[in-house]
UniProtKB/Swiss-Prot annotation:
One Pfam family recorded for the sequence: tRNA-synt_1d
TM regions (residue ranges): none
Record's keyword annotation contains ATP-binding: yes
Source lineage: Bacteria, Pseudomonadati, Campylobacterota, Epsilonproteobacteria, Campylobacterales
Reactions this protein catalyses: tRNA(Arg) + L-arginine + ATP = L-arginyl-tRNA(Arg) + AMP + diphosphate
Highest taxon above the source species: Bacteria
Protein name: Arginine--tRNA ligase
GO MF annotation terms: arginine-tRNA ligase activity; ATP binding
Subunit structure, as described in the record: Monomer.
Organism (species): Helicobacter pylori (strain J99 / ATCC 700824)
Primary residence: cytoplasm
Gene Ontology CC entries for this record: cytoplasm
Amino acid sequence: MHTLIKGVLEEILEAEVIIEYPKDREHGHYATPIAFNLAKVFKKSPLAIAEELALKIGSHEKTQGFFDRVVACKGYINFTLSLDFLERFTQKALELKEQFGSQVKSERSQKIFLEFVSANPTGPLHIGHARGAVFGDSLAKIARFLGHEVLCEYYVNDMGSQIRLLGVSVWLAYKEHVLKESVTYPEVFYKGEYIIEIAKKAHNDLEPSLFKENEETIIEVLSDYAKDLMLLEIKGNLDALDIHFDSYASEKEVFKHKDAVFDRLEKANALYEKDSKTWLKSSLYQDESDRVLIKEDKSYTYLAGDIVYHDEKFQQNYTKYINIWGADHHGYIARVKASLEFLGYDSSKLEVLLAQMVRLLKDNEPYKMSKRAGNFILIKDVIDDVGKDALRFIFLSKRLDTHLEFDVNTLKKQDSSNPIYYIHYANSRIHTMLEKSPFSKEEILQTPLKNLNAEEKYLLFSALSLPKAVESSFEEYGLQKMCEYAKTLASEFHRFYNAGKILDTPKAKELLKICLMVSLSLTNAFKLLGIEIKTKISSKD
């Protein structure tokens, strides 16, 4: 609907047209500020240009049947859609059902490589990981809905110092809690009951002879053993959020190709030796300084592994590569992009989205940390507390790059202060009316819309605006727009529902048709957010 009108206006005016939603619904369904852009060109006031263009658009043969009104107002051109136009789109939307709001694959379709979560398999997933996980999963759902091809990958950091530290931590816990020895822990190690759990499980699972080997062998085996257990638990946590990856890439496997990548960097004159280290000339590509890839002891830095991994990704020739990282990884963006340029790739194809911090409250107090994980709030604990759907909604309700703070008790309330409940409640009200209605769904669908007032038309317009919300959410990586859309539509429906009777009116079938349209849009919006909308819900209002 939005796209059609924009295209027709651009054809008539032979200029790019921006379509907006008026702040005041009394001004119509759409507005354009094009007169302000043309004022300098024609050396006339925006008001005069708007009046001329409004007349031209309203009388043009290509817009016949589109609008009830096209008027100039303070330099803007405002459009009120006709009921015939709205009905045409309503009929098409209701026929499309779960595909309403989507697009078929076209020449504009992209091939997208989406990497997210990628938490080190050294501990359970905590609430900080969950935000990026939910965002990435919903972004993939929306991209696929819009006809794009998406591969979702989890990059498993299964080598290096952190994995060894995991093995050391489990070995020390084994000695203390299984062998009952006195242990001196290092300054840095993995804490939490989960480490003790792994140590005790290792005692039952692994051959007793292992623990008679030299300490380095024991640590190496325990590192792999603990890593595999943690990855299994991480996958279980993701399952609980209904998040599933197409691929899990092992850093250990990917890094086997490091020599070929470093040879190419060498040939590109991207490396140099200094202080017995190998450096990347990343400062040539807007990085703050050059970066070490190989340390004095000939071990590789974390960045070296990232470079090899991104080389493997870019060899697969996707249209776009999206990484979702924690905000603390901001400094890595320039250095990774620099390596891509040295390797001969177009680094602009890589987009890195940063997930900001999450602060959870309960009864206005900081949420209790997990004893099992040490100083973290586990995803599993919060899912058990408020449910998967509520958690997904709240994580998507704010821009990914802004800090998020919320009280989980809000998500347990059964009133309008709980946004996800109020959206479920709107859909529940619709289904209750449909059950009470003497009309079949087929009768309602075949009913022409002839007698709607301005408020009813606006509710229908809002329900039909889902495609624009979907498109904007993807193009701007602003998934909060989907949450805002669902909240606004639910709020408008509740206002409509509370304004008067629906079933006991001569135009009951017309109003129920609007309700079907609202339910369809809420259902499809929630599906893209990874939430199953409810058709039955209790209320304490």
